[in-house]
């Protein structure tokens, strides 16, 4: 158990009433509606939550902490009845003053939407695929599931026998850090009252750690790294905190400029991922890359590959931002299959 509970600055005393929250949502929506090409709003929202958590365990631990969260989001509509497009922007922070300005969220949602108008179909091909950060984090989510102690104990992960093996190229580092000040996934102790420390899941491309709680560590016969998470009525199970792929050494613009013929993914649909075999197939939308530049919008394609190969070929940009509890920079994966027309 933990002896000294760290202060991670996870609670903002600032309070918004319902009218102020409504005004924030309206401001966000109005800024989206001002952008040329937007035909309607798909809704805007703002929220505030305050949580007080206290844990007492049978082995003598008793401690607690408070968390706050503020968020705003907006979704806009553009195009016509024959080809209607929608997209969004969103921000979430522990402290209200750190939240992105409403005008910026609305404007970004609108610009994202307008840029998708008049999409084209593309032919089936092998192509380099660039994942925008808002969808590249889904790859990190798959990694999180693959290294979760429950998956390893059950044998339902293709990484279960790969500890200390090379999974990625040597530039890839994947970290879980519960101690980030004002972090959306930060916790001063895990949900079994144990001390939590930062650790590398992937270090220089090599698999170094599972995500474990007490139960899964005992099942696997190794030391726990204290990642227990639970609800009010559920048993603890391992879960990441602030998990992220470290920034690489190349910019997003450099990655795109080096691609003659590729696909930039901004949207993913469906759940066609098999964590036992690694087979990966998901519906996608985004933009064609031609001669090193973002070209026209593309929709209704499927991107496919195998996670084992995708991890091995993964290249990361230097644009990591912490917007969620799982965060990733722009990711390039060469030679994926794109199923189009």
What residues fall within each predicted segment?
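Active-site bordering "gate/hinge" segments
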Residues: 1-194, 203-206, 293, 327-341
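Dual-mode signal for accessory low-complexity, basic/Gly-rich regions
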Residues: 162-341
């Amino acid at each position: 158990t933990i002896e000294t509970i760290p202060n991670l600055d996870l609670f903002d005393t600032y309070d918004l009433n319902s009218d102020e929250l409504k005004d924030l949502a309206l401001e966000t929506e109005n800024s989206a509606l001002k952008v040329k090409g937007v035909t309607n709003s798909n809704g805007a929202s703002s929220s505030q939550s305050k949580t007080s958590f206290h844990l007492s365990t049978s082995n003598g631990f008793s401690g607690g902490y408070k968390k706050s969260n503020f968020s705003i989001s907006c979704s806009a509509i553009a195009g016509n009845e024959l080809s209607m497009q929608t997209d969004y922007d969103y921000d979430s922070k522990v402290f209200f003053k750190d939240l992105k300005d409403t005008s910026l969220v609305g404007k970004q949602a609108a610009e994202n939407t307008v840029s998708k108008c008049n999409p084209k179909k593309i032919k089936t091909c092998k192509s380099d695929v660039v994942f925008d950060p808002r969808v590249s984090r889904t790859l990190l989510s798959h990694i999180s599931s693959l290294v979760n102690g429950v998956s390893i104990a059950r044998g339902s992960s293709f990484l279960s026998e790969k500890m200390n093996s090379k999974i990625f190229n040597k530039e890839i580092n994947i970290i879980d850090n519960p101690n980030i000040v004002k972090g959306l996934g930060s916790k001063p102790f895990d949900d079994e009252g144990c001390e939590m420390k930062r650790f590398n899941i992937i270090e220089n491309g090599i698999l170094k750690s599972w995500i474990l709680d007490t139960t899964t560590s005992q099942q696997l016969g190794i030391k726990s790294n204290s990642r227990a998470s639970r609800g009010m009525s559920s048993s603890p199970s391992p879960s990441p905190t602030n998990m992220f792929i470290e920034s690489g050494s190349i910019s997003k613009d450099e990655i795109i400029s080096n691609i003659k013929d590729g696909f930039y993914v901004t949207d993913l649909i469906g759940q066609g991922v098999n964590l036992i075999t690694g087979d990966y197939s998901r519906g996608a939308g985004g933009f064609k890359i031609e001669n090193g530049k973002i070209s026209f919008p593309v929709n209704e394609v499927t991107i496919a590959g195998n996670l084992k190969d995708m991890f091995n070929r993964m290249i990361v940009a230097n644009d990591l931002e912490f917007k969620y509890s799982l965060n990733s920079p722009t990711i390039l994966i060469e030679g994926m299959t794109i199923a189009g027309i």
